[in-house]
Amino acid sequence: MNLIDYEKQYDVIVAGAGHAGCEAALAAARMGCETLLLTINLDAIALMSCNPAIGGLAKGHLVKEIDALGGEMGKNIDATGIQYRILNTRKGPAVRASRAQADKQLYRLRMKHVMEEQEHLSLKQGEVTGLVVEDGRVRGVVTKVGVRFLGKTVILTTGTFMRGLIHVGLTNYPGGRAGDLPSVGLSDQLRDLGFTVGRLKTGTPARLDGNTIDFSRLEPQYGDDPPVPFSFSTERIDRPQLPCYIAYTNERTHEIIRSGLDRSPLYSGVIEGVGPRYCPSIEDKVMRFPDKDRHQSFLEPEGRDTVEYYPSGLSTSLPIDIQYRLYRSIEGLENVEIMRPAYAIEYDYVDPIQLHTSLETKLIRNLYHAGQINGTSGYEEAAGQGLMAGINAALRVQGEEPLVLGRDEAYIGVMIDDLVTLGTREPYRMFTSRAEYRLLLREDNADLRLRERGHAVGLVRDEEYRLFLEKRERIGAELERLRTAKLLPSEADPSFLETYGMTDLRNALTFEQLLRRPDITYEELSQIDPVAGMVPPSVKEQVEIQIKYQGYIERQLDQVARARKLEGTRIPDDLDYTVIPGLSAEVREKLLRFLPDTLGQASRIQGVTPAAVGILSVAIKSRSASS
């Protein structure tokens, strides 16, 4: 094919406009880089291919972090959501999480508008079929119609599109998702360049016609009132919310599913890719948990101006006749019509251990990977990676050091470290349990952790940063006030003392000491402290958490300080593991495969013992001394 060179050269080229691609392109453009976003379909920018929702357990943490760094996802869901809830409100602050139902089409359209109006960002429709690589560096991309776009850096955010194959029963056909063509050729070139390309699988349920659902027989689930925004920049959300509905499968449903397993691509061996462990299909759940007589599903509206409903928990790749029978066996859905069939999709991904923590590939300089190409699942995981890839591609263009978030700084840092240190053989999703310092990585303090970083790279606007500094200052001032303000026994309200078991109080207590008690919150404190009632809610929340959990927080900070010694020791790129005495053959093999960037990463590789880490540390110090 004769290639046509496009007239303009770019700083950053992003291939793919899903949730990773959008954040990557916006970050690079907002940092002043001339950025090109290429996508197979401009009408599918930020399309929610699966559930119409943002956030959830640990995923809400990622969205808050994206927002704190200056990303767009939090603002977008605040502007287009139709129901908002805080999960785990009865548990500790470390595991509380925000979740919102989205108006699927409004979400897509608003994100597209934001990108169209973004300075330094160009959007073009085109399928990237190859990379331009010279002397171990990426120089640009080639599209299906023969246009070569040249750029200093390239970010691949291919989603489920690389050699995507859709399955409905034993019927399968190429597709990146329902209604879109797959990307062909790119994964073959990546394999030729030395990348390890694997195969994964995911799936989605049918979309149901709400006009054919009997909602009177289902249990409604309402959002929180008032709704709590995702973005630290959103003051409030005033739009009315829509309910979801809870339904359950039954034994008849399970019998129907079992009767169709001979035509299931999952159980007949047609699907080769590994599916998501934590988001199994309904046939998988029925077979893995035969003792369960029912499984829950939330019927989620896809928007205000559509009748389509998404039945979460009921994804399947069974044939369409079985799909009709299984959905209609559920109470309230006896007459339901399927508007879009459920399906499974297989796609190629690249082993993420071939990435640096900056998300730049180890094999090709200036090439970055983000999102499902790295083996992750979920919009939020993709967006977090996309944001970091966009930031680091822009920093490379600007000649600056990459921004790498530590495991003690952000869930984004935990996720990327997990991926590049351990790799993945199944779709990776974020959980709070993956973070060893989760009390430090709460949703509520994402701005305190990351706003400085976002402002330093140019993503957090000056006005947003000013408001953040004011909030941080007020938190510090309030903590100091509570340490000095006192409840004196001679002046205390007897009823207050009696209520909280302090009738024998002899010595003065500071308000900080009072607030440390589990039975006293700001609401109770305001009975004896008029100033407490005037403290802004966001400041109250921070102050109360910091006081009540002070001992636990200090303990985790001590753990972080010890771990940073390993994290701060970089392993030279040209360190020859084969000549270091004392390393076992297994350890050498693991180190040569994973090529860790730091001693901290090396310590997390399965099979690399503390003794081996000590030997590595000595080898690095000896090398530094001799040079």
UniProtKB/Swiss-Prot annotation:
In Gene Ontology terms, what is a biological process of this protein?
A: tRNA methylation
Location in the cell:
Cytoplasm
User: For binding NAD(+), which residues are annotated in this chain's numbering?
Assistant: 275-289
Q: Chief location of this protein?
A: cytoplasm
Record's keyword terms, sorted = Cytoplasm, FAD, Flavoprotein, NAD, tRNA processing
What GO cellular component entries does it have? cytosol
Disulfide linkages recorded for this protein, renumbered to the chain, are none
Show the GO MF annotations: flavin adenine dinucleotide binding
Q: Which cofactor does it need?
A: FAD
**Which residues of the sequence carry a binding annotation for FAD?**
G16, A17, G18, H19, A20, G21, V128, S183, Q372
Q: How does it assemble?
A: Homodimer. Heterotetramer of two MnmE and two MnmG subunits.
**What family, per the record?**
Belongs to the MnmG family.
* NCBIfam families referenced in this protein's UniProt entry, alphabetically: mnmG_gidA
Q: What does this protein do?
A: NAD-binding protein involved in the addition of a carboxymethylaminomethyl (cmnm) group at the wobble position (U34) of certain tRNAs, forming tRNA-cmnm(5)s(2)U34.
* Entry protein name: tRNA uridine 5-carboxymethylaminomethyl modification enzyme MnmG
User: Where does this protein come from, organism-wise?
Assistant: Geobacter sulfurreducens (strain ATCC 51573 / DSM 12127 / PCA)
Q: Give the encoding gene's name.
A: mnmG
